[in-house]
Amino acid sequence: MIYRINRKIIKTYEKTLKAVFSMRARNKSFVTFSKIGLVRLGNQLFRYAALKSYSLRNKVPIILPPDTEHRLNNFKIEYLSKPLYWLNYSSDSKYVEKKFNFDSNFFSFHNRTEINGFFQTEKYFKDIRQILQTDLKLANCKKEKKAIENIKLIKQEFPGKKIVSIHVRRGDYVPSSKPYSDGITDYSPDRHLKHPLMTVDYFQSAAARFQNAVFLIFSDTNQDIEWCKENLNIKNAVYIHNEDLIDFKMMQFSDHNIISNSSFSWWAAWLNDNDRKQIISPKKENWFGEFYSHYNMNDLIPRDWEQL
C-alpha cells in the first residue's frame, strides 16, 4: 500500500517537473515576485505597480504564487497563479533592487525573471497611471461604492467645502517597550527609529494651507482616532474609522490629501483622480528615521506634491 502511494507521489512529481521544463524549453517568458506578500498593503502596491510596468514594457505575463498573505486579491488585478515551487524551478534570472532610488536597468532583464525590492518611486510606473487606476479598483464593488457614498454624504453635509483627507499614521510607529505584530511581520520595539511619527505641528500646518475645507481624519485604530481627537485640534474635522480598504478609497476620492510617512496614504493620494488636487507630504528627509538615514530619498515624493 505504501509502495503504491509512493509510486503515485513520484509520478505526480515527475509530471510536475516535466511540465516545468517543458515551459522552459518553449522559452515562455514571465515576471514574478514570489515574496510580494511579505510586506503591508502600501508596499505591496509599489511592488505590484513595478511588476505591471515591467510586464507591459517587456510584453510578458505576471505570475504570482497563490499566497494568502498578499492582499492583491482585494483589487481588480489579473495575474497568472502558480505554486511557489513552480516559480523556484522556472525563473532563471533575478533582479534585486540595490538602491532605494530609481534604477533604469530594472526594465532590461528578460525571460523568466524574479524581482525583489521595494520600488518606492512613481518613476517605475508613472506612464501606466490610468491602467493602475483601473487595476486598483476594489474587487468587492460594494466596498468601492460604500467609499464613494460616504464621500457624497459628507459633501451633502458640508456643501461647498473642499474635502481634505488627513492620514495620521500611528499604530506600530508609536514608541513602545514591547514588540509589535500586524499578523504578517513581527516588529522590534525600536521600530520608531525606522519610521518616526509625524508631529502635531506638521498636520496643523498642512491643514492651515486649505481654506473653506472639511478634514477627514483617518488613523490605524480606534485608540489612534481618540488620540487624534484629543491632540490635533483641527477645526471642521470628521473622524473616520472603517475597515482599511474603505478608508483607503475614501482618501483616494477626497479632493485633496495630507499624508503621513506611509506607503498606504502615499498610494491613496497618488490614485486621487482630481486634476486640481493638492497633496501635502512630509519632507523626504523626514520619511524614515535614523535607521534608514543612508537611503537616497530623492525619487520617493512626486515633484508636484508639496513637502512640508
How would you describe each model-predicted region?
Residues I36-F46:
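A short, glycine/small-residue-rich beta-strand->loop->alpha-helix junction that serves as a flexible
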Residues L41, Q204-Y295:
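Donor-binding and catalytic core of enzymes assembling or modifying cell-surface/extracellular glycoconjugates
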Residues L64-P66, S165-V168, L216-S219, S281:
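Short beta-strand segments
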Residues K15-L38:
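Nucleotide-activated donor-dependent transferases that construct or modify glycoconjugates
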Residues M1-T16:
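Boundary detector for helix-to-coil junctions that initiate low-complexity/charged tails
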Residues Q44-L56, V200-A207:
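Histidine-anchored nucleotide/phosphate-binding helix
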Residues S293-L308:
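Acidic, PIN/NYN-like endoribonuclease modules and their adjacent C-terminal/linker elements
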Residues R26-V31, D67-S205, R209, I301-D304:
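Secretory-pathway luminal glycosyltransferase catalytic domains
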